[in-house]
Amino acid sequence: SSKLKPNCNYSKNKLHTEKILLKNLKNRILILRISNLIGINKFRNNNKKIHKTFIDSFFLNVQRGIIFNNEKNYKDFLSINKFGEIIEKLINKKVVGIYNVSLGQKVYLTKLVNWLNLFNKNKYKSIDIPKSYKTECFYLNNDKLMKKINIKNRLIDLEKACKAISKFFFKKKNK
């Protein structure tokens, strides 16, 4: 395992909390470090959100006719359905420890945007990301989790989920 070096207070606090929990609960705790989840939230209440997700920002911008040029940027994403499958396996196997829950590979935002925009019939313009936007690229190593629960986690599953989201969102908007 690699040495963790959090670079912001939020990350430092999460790591500090993990250490306290591990110290107090030893081998009776499951800590999940979850990547960006992608799914349809049919029960969305935007008034209660702490921050916007990538999907929130994407659909807000696409409604304005804007898509950001994200050619070089990548992150790690996981469909909400795959996340549910992973959680179910973890519960059934009574797993304890610390695990990264993710696809475990780079997902270029351009590719993700193309999937999410598949059913969009409206015109839009592609613009460069403003310099002021924070564009941190990362992906999580999920080898430990995949070995533990023996599950297949594939990019094609994320692609299918994104296309289903696109169909759901744009079919509703195009009516």
Task: Please annotate each region the language model reported.
Residues 20-74, 80:
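NAD(P)-dependent short-chain dehydrogenase/reductase
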Residues 156-175:
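Amphipathic terminal alpha-helices
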Residues 8, 49, 53, 75-81, ...:
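Residue-level signal for the nucleotide or nucleotide-sugar donor/cofactor binding architecture
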Residues 1-6:
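Short alpha-helical oligomerization interface
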Residues 9, 13:
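Active-site helix of classical SDR
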Residues 81-89, 159, 163:
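Amphipathic alpha-helical segments that line or abut small-molecule/effector binding pockets
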